[in-house]
């Protein structure tokens, strides 16, 4: 299955807030909510919705998510927490959390167009797994810095997680450590995703 490119607000209405997908928020439509979401939720439906939240928030395909679940299952720690750590340490997500991109798809585009350096090397793979003490910077040209400057100016510095630091003057971010569960920017029950 390919990456989702359709209407984003429809997904937000169905699944709830997905800050990585878009900054837009749907208008309140209480009548429609009662119409479509009546009745008891089955266990399968609950698990499917949690999985879809994770997929659409991080912009993953079905196959990528399955691969991350398999990697997390081999770890000795809690599978759900390892899964979230793997997803949060992706380069496109770290750019989004630093405020260098307004959404995760925007961060993917920055990486694909070779505007981002990790430890002084150009990285054009959005799923690149960052490690502690990685330094993330923009290319040293005006165009790259202009793209990141707009996003940094509009981002909220109070929402920066503890495992990341950013220098807004030099357009440089630093990964301090692997994140804790409480700093994940998405309300999700990761155990339901693993069970699915």
Curated annotation (Swiss-Prot):
Q: Where in this chain does the record put each S4 RNA-binding domain?
A: 89-169
Biased amino acid composition, Basic residues? 24-38
Q: Does the entry feature the keyword Zinc, yes or no? A: no
Q: Which gene encodes it?
A: rps4
Q: Name one GO molecular function term.
A: rRNA binding
InterPro entries, A to Z? Ribosomal_uS4, Ribosomal_uS4_bac-type, Ribosomal_uS4_CS, Ribosomal_uS4_N, S4_RNA-bd, S4_RNA-bd_sf
Which species does this protein come from?
A: Lygeum spartum
Which locations, inside or outside the cell, does it occupy?
Answer: Plastid, Chloroplast
Query: Is rRNA-binding tagged as a keyword?
Result: yes
Q: Out of the domains of life, which is the source?
A: Eukaryota
One GO biological process from the UniProt record? ribosomal small subunit biogenesis
Its biological purpose is as follows: One of the primary rRNA binding proteins, it binds directly to 16S rRNA where it nucleates assembly of the body of the 30S subunit.
Keyword terms of this UniProt record: Chloroplast, Plastid, Ribonucleoprotein, Ribosomal protein, RNA-binding, rRNA-binding
Q: Where is this region: Disordered?
A: 17-38
Instruction: Name the family the entry cites.
Output: Belongs to the universal ribosomal protein uS4 family.
What name has this protein been given in UniProt?
A: Small ribosomal subunit protein uS4c
Q: Name one GO cellular component term.
A: small ribosomal subunit
Listed Gene3D superfamilies:
Ribosomal Protein S4 Delta 41, Chain A, domain 1, RNA-binding S4 domain
């Amino acid at each position: 299955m390919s990456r989702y490119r359709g209407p984003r607000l429809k997904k937000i209405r169905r699944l709830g807030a997905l800050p990585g997908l878009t900054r837009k928020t749907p208008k309140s439509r209480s009548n429609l909510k009662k119409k479509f979401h009546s009745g008891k939720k089955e266990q399968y439906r609950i698990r499917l919705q949690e999985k879809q939240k994770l997929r659409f928030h991080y912009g993953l395909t079905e196959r990528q998510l399955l691969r991350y679940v398999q990697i997390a299952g081999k770890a000795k720690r809690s599978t759900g927490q390892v899964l979230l750590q793997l997803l949060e340490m992706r380069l496109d997500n770290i750019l989004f959390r630093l405020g260098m991109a307004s959404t995760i798809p925007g961060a993917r585009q920055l990486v694909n167009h070779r505007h981002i350096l990790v430890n002084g090397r150009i990285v054009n793979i959005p799923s690149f797994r960052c490690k502690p003490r990685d330094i993330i910077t923009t290319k040293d040209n005006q165009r790259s810095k202009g793209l990141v400057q707009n996003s940094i100016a509009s981002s909220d510095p109070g929402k920066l997680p503890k495992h990341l630091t950013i220098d807004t003057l030099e357009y440089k971010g630093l990964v301090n450590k692997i994140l804790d569960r409480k700093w994940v920017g998405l309300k999700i029950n990761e155990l339901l995703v693993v069970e699915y």
